C-alpha cells in the first residue's frame, strides 16, 4: 500500500457500500489546525478540481467477489479513499512512504496543514458534482442526501418568505439522524429546549411550567 496514498474512512449511517465504488468522490469539511485556525475543505466539485475514489477489482480478477451477497461485495473496511500515487522525488532514506510524503507536501502548500491536523478534522466523502434534474421531464432530482435535503430546504425557504407570523416560527435543522440522532447537535440532545428557555428568559417570562406549556402548545410539521 505504500505505492498509494489512501485515506482510511468510516462509513456514516446505513449505506449500500457498493454504491461508492469507482464513483467520482469529493471531500467536504473542516480541519482545525494546531494554531486554532480552521481550514474549510471542498475539493472535487469545482471545475478543474481533482476527484477521488474507491478502487475495485477488474472483472477478470473478481470471480470470487461476484459470488458474494451484495452486503458483502464491498466491506466497510474496504471503503478506503485513493488520493494519490506519485512518490516524492527525494534521496532521503528517512522518507519511507514517499507517496504519502508527496501528498502531505501538497496539502501543506495548498492548505498549510500537517498530518497531525487530521486528528481535529471533520471531513466527509460524498459523490462529486452538483445535483441535477433527472428525466426528460425534469421531474426528479439526482443527488446525494435528498431524503433529508428535500425536507430541510423547503423548511428553511418557508422561514425566509414568511412575513409577520402570528406565532413564533422555528426551523430546526439537526444532524446525526443516520446514526441515531446522537451528539450535541442531534435530536436526542436538549439544545432546542435550552434555546427556547433562553429566549423566554430574555423576554422575562421564563419558568419551568411556562417552558413546558410552550413546548406542549407547539405544532410540528
Region spans (language model):
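N-terminal hydrophobic/helix-forming segments and targeting peptides
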Residues: 1-221
